[in-house]
Amino acid sequence: MNNTISDYIYMYLQYCQHQKKLSRNTLRAYQIDMAQFIVYLNSQAADRSPKEIDKKTIQAYVDNLATHYAPRTCKRKIACLKAFFSHLEFEDIITVSPFRKLRIAIKEPRVLPRTIKKADMSILLQHVYTSAKETNTPYQHFNAVRNIAIYELLISTGIRIGELCRLQTDSIDFDSGTIQIYGKGDKERTVYLTSDIVKKALQNYALLREQLTEISTDYFFVNWNNKRIKEENVRSQMRKASHALLHKRITPHMFRHTFATTLLENKVDIRYIQELLGHSSIKTTQIYLHLSNASIRTALNQAKLREQYS
């Protein structure tokens, strides 16, 4: 009996999980994208063999995606599918990937990363520190001290929210001032604790964490029930605080953008920034060059150089 493309997708996802060691979020996205492709194929004909998938089928599917999704989402879904067929070609399941010599042009408008203004950052930091002093219960105090550690770590290292939530206690070395981060694709990198303020915030939280009874997890950031803190919990707290204090939406990823832009504006080599952010390609980091240029233009406009000679 010949395997259908659904069978090969299942095997590919197993390969991604157990051999490529993709993160849970990436696997979930792959599952959704692959299932969507199967639904499309079934709407056109019966589930078929990968050898029957040709360029016309792929192009028609890409056109279908483009009518329903934003360019960035389309690119992600296409990249997932392209990786799948490349895997089939590598394993000699198909002779050649239908993506070979297939030109897919999806224009994505360039959107500069949103950063946090210095004044807004000061207000947020002041808020989390003040909250820790005004708590009435051990539960409230624990959450407040943990929030301080989260905010300080995000702004001082630029790590992703997923990386923060998956951070292990033994990955932090206070003596050397380093943290080992396992990013996308389980790629390991080092970030640095160069501020005593940040170290103290993390150590204060670590002390409270140790005082919790029956610690049953190696994750550094936990909730009151000793469970790993969820990304949505961090986003929710930050969303509520920023709306209440600033009347705007601040996200954890904006801390990352702010970290990178601040380094660039302080003349840090972009290759160092690439390493700290865990970007596999320098092109991803180069978007901050455009953001820095925008900051330069704003500064020049505010200076009104020519008007000074009128």
Show which residues each predicted segment covers.
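Conserved catalytic core of the tyrosine transesterase superfamily
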Residues: 1-310
